[in-house]
Amino acid sequence: MSILQALQDFLEGYEGMELRPPGEILTDLTRAAPPSYSLAPAGGGTDTQDVVGNRYYTSRYHFFALECAGDEADRAENYDFLESLASWLEDQEDQGNYPELPGRYSVEGIAVQYATLYDVSQNGAGLYQVQIELTIKKEVVPNG
């Protein structure tokens, strides 16, 4: 399992999404019709290394939500959803409840950087983007 897949699985635990089919957060792109969700890597790098050699990364991901955005009520409801998702992620951070990563990787922190309307199609579907930031530790393998 990849780090991306682990984060997708973790986000599927948020009960505010209308996943159709259930348990489906796609990679990189949403489906053509709302509601649809996807997750895409957005960069990061090695931030620090501790004295024993453990590495700490900041990895960013774009969570996309394709929702109906044809009128003011739809858009207001969509921002309620985004605020609720951000609040849920903050709660997970406060509780130390993080995605289970493969191998020697573990999550040290999770945060939402921003949430915004990214694009609106001619059919009135809005593509919303939430930037999620993970602080990841890669544990060093002891010699011997």
Name every feature range the model reports, one short phrase each.
Residues A40:
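Glycine-rich loop at the start of a catalytic domain that most often binds anionic cofactors/ligands
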Residues A32-S36:
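Extended compositionally biased segments used for macromolecular assembly or nucleic-acid engagement
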Residues M1-D28, G43-G144:
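Charged, amphipathic alpha-helical segments and their flanking helix caps
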